[in-house]
Amino acid sequence: QAVQPGDQVAVRGPGGHWQTPDDICHLLAVADAVALPAVANTLATLPISARATIVRVNSHHDYPLPLTDRVTVVTAPRDPDGIVATVQGLDLPQNTHAFVHGEAAMVRPMRRHLRLERGLPRDRIHLSAYWFAGRDADGWRAIKQDFNRSMDAESGD
């Protein structure tokens, strides 16, 4: 299909490594504004039988998500402790898969909570720290491997 001048188009970047599991019953997605497009893509691949809880970190950005009656959206404050407290208050069914993407200071305590407090197995958690407050892309890239290793060590992985 050809695009004509004046047509609206959407451009997508490369996809991530996570694919929605076929047997997923419940998805917990925790995301800041930067990660909402990834959450939207994940919701689009969610099986019809699955439910989702989206914890949307409060921001001034309002990215449209494909919401249905199977999706619940909860807003969390921007601070990492507030995000974890919001998730602690959720009743998560068995076979929950977690998709946590956003700023590094949010991702680290969420991993700790999901692995150590909730007992979610590593293979049911997908985390990605997209950015690190106060660092540019090169600065974040320079320390990201060490950051990921320290998160693994913290949660016994």
Regions of interest found by a model, annotated:
Residues 1-157:
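Extended, composition-driven regions rather than compact fold-specific motifs
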